């Protein structure tokens, strides 16, 4: 994968997250902001999830209250380089915990 392909795929990931949060119908308030390639999700309780791209490594990084995760693209899924879990699984787990209600991005 070259740099432009990596950025295209990361942009697609950001857009999917943003669209799901724009359509969020849950009880808690969840905000999403993209600034300089960093996506920040802020929850009603003040906690945050930060997602950014690491161009030199072609990785997506996810920072949550539970910890930090690094994802490599394997096939068509972003997979954690430590646990083998998908980006979406870990994001949904963290967002659900931080929102206090079920949050789905799929």
UniProtKB/Swiss-Prot annotation:
Database matches in Pfam families: Frataxin_Cyay
PROSITE patterns: FRATAXIN_1, FRATAXIN_2
SUPFAM superfamilies recorded: Frataxin/Nqo15-like
GO biological process: iron-sulfur cluster assembly
GO cellular component terms given for this protein: cytosol
Biological function: Involved in iron-sulfur (Fe-S) cluster assembly. May act as a regulator of Fe-S biogenesis.
Record-stated family: Belongs to the frataxin family.
UniProt protein name: Iron-sulfur cluster assembly protein CyaY
């Amino acid at each position: 994968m070259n740099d432009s392909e990596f950025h295209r795929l990361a942009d697609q990931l950001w857009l999917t997250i943003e669209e799901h949060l724009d359509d969020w119908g849950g009880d808690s308030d969840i905000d999403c902001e993209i600034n300089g390639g960093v996506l920040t999700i802020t929850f009603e309780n003040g906690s945050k999830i930060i997602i950014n791209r690491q161009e030199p490594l072609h990785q997506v990084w996810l920072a949550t209250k539970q910890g930090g995760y690094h994802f490599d693209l394997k096939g068509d899924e972003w997979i954690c380089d430590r646990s083998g879990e998908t980006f979406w699984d870990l994001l949904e787990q963290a967002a659900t915990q931080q929102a206090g209600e079920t949050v789905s991005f799929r």
